[in-house]
């Protein structure tokens, strides 16, 4: 969300470096690596009392092109997402999304 990022005191663009990506079938692991890094940043921000939101960029070609142009990124860096960080207007109570029926043990037990 470009409007949100423009108003925030901080935005972090998480990029995959294709010069360091694995070869062959493992090449797309950069998405998982960057996603794990993103989640760690979100958790750290929350732990510091900051608000944060993960805004997706990749695999949208239009979004990737816009971020690449704005930041003058070289071709080997692919922007996965932008993390917008700021100060929340109020404390939000976490939602309890736990549902026992969403858990399966040893095999999938849900609707086929």
Residues of each region from the PLM?
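Acidic, surface-exposed loops and disordered segments
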Residues: 1-112
């Amino acid at each position: 969300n470009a409007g949100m990022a423009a108003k925030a005191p901080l935005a972090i663009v998480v990029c995959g470096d294709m010069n360091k990506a694995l070869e062959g079938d493992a090449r797309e692991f950069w998405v998982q690596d960057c996603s794990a890094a993103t989640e760690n940043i979100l958790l750290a921000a929350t732990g510091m009392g900051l608000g944060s939101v993960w805004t997706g960029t990749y695999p949208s070609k239009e979004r990737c092109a816009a971020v690449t142009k704005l930041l003058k990124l070289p071709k080997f860096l692919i922007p996965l997402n932008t993390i917008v960080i700021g100060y929340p207007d109020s404390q939000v109570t976490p939602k309890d999304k736990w549902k026992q029926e969403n858990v399966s043990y040893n095999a999938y037990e849900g609707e086929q």
